[in-house]
Structures are given as C-alpha cells and as structure tokens.
C-alpha cells in the first residue's frame, strides 16, 4: 500500500457552503490508528470546528448548532469511529437526514495496512478498541469489516501506510485549505525580560545588545512607536546588520515551517522593559516577515506589544 489519495468521481477539494444552512460538514472516520487524530488537529488548524468521538446520531444536532451560531461556526469536522454494531446503519441514517436537508457534507476515510496498524499499536502499547480478549490483528480485521461499506461511499480515502505526520497534514491541507487562508500565521510580540518570557514563543530575539533609549532623557518617556525612538534605535551600530541577518534566518525558518505543515509562528522580541528597543525591532521584523510572503504562500503577520504601558 502507498500513500495514495482516492477520490470518487464527484468528489471535490472541499464541500461548498449550502445556501440553506451555510454549513460545511466533514465526517472523519476510518481505521483506528490510521491518523484520525492528526487529521482532526490539522482541520482544527485550518479553522474547522472539530468534535471528537461524535455518535452518528448527533451529526444533525451539530449542524443545527452551527446554524444557530449565526455564522460563528460554518465548518464542522466530526470524528466518528466504531463503537457498536449499529455504527454503519446509524451513520447512513444520519447522513441521509443531512443530505435531505441539503447540507454540504463530505466523508473522509483513513486507512493503513494491517502490518502498519499493528506496528503503531505496539509502539504506543495500547489495545485496539475492538480487540477485546483476542489478538490485535483480530480487532483490526473486525473494524476493517465493519467499515467496509463506509469506505465504499467515502468521498476521500487516504492510505497513511507510508505517510508520516507531516505528509498526512499536507494531504489534508491540500484537500480542505481555504484559498483565502494564509499558509502561515505569524505573531511578533515584544516583551520585557523583567516581566518574563512569553510562554508561547517559538523563537526569541534579545535586543539588549543595543543601547537603551531609557538613558536618553528626551527619549525616556517615549516608546518604540515614536519616530524619535525608532530612529535612535535603528541608527545604532549593529542594528541594520542584525535586521538583515535575522531576516535571512526568518526566511529559512518560514520555509521549514511551510514544508513541515506548521501554520503558526510566534516570534518574541525582548529588551529590558519591553518599552523601547523590542518595540522597534518587533515592528521591523514584522515588516520583514511580510516581505517573505509569496503568491503561493501568503503570510498573515500580527504584531503585539505585551508589556507596553506597564511602566
């Protein structure tokens, strides 16, 4: 088996919004251990409202929740797995109701070879949910049989046998990414070391190698948002060299993030109090990040000044 994606003839890259409900629904199912959790997390990163282990009979309820949200929830991904012998009939019944309502829905089925599933379960030292007192292979075989008909009606089948996590994410992104959604969301946050590092930082830049405007009387009451402080900081020896050099580092990091399917980057830029130097450098690096965007890989860059105003 290979990492192939099979589509039914009428399959599409993503379901269209239905004019009646305004809701897109993806039913994510397949064999245990085939990567449902990874696929669900990827959909969540793409902006889908993800519900795990949802009984088929509650699919209609979830769509109603989306309708009542007034547009706050318009993309729902429901992870559905085998829990009973009635699974298939319950799922078919629920899908029939949704289709009669005109809901735009799509079924995604994940699978892998028996040998690969056995290897994955043995690696995590967990039993198969349908194994009972029998062998692991028996549980896999039983689940495969229970889901055979569901696989047959799936709009998208992904064989994850030879896929790593990043490759699976890539396939999900290719199938469900909104064309208007950026490839990477980057947040550049300035901070003061005296208040501690931002807990969610992926990269940290220390600006304390630059002279501190705090010791310049006329600049002390100002912030890095003021032109006088900005000009002072950027005129210091090493400031431009640092920005040019670190911009190249960011280019390498962004390329790697995109290759690995990572969609979020937080860059923390620090100085002593988070008032002058870090604010200037954060704004400059944010602009450099924006320049890294291409037509194929749009980057959404936000700037936050965490400790500005604390002094």
From Swiss-Prot:
It comes from Acidothermus cellulolyticus (strain ATCC 43068 / DSM 8971 / 11B). Displays ATPase and GTPase activities. Keywords: ATP-binding, GTP-binding, Nucleotide-binding. Coiled coil: none annotated. One of its GO terms (molecular function) is ATP binding. HAMAP family: RapZ_like. Belongs to the RapZ-like family. InterPro entries: P-loop_NTPase (IPR027417), RapZ-like (IPR005337), RapZ-like_N (IPR053930), RapZ_C (IPR053931). This is Nucleotide-binding protein Acel_1111. GTP binds at residues 81-84. Pfam families: PapZ_C, RapZ-like_N.
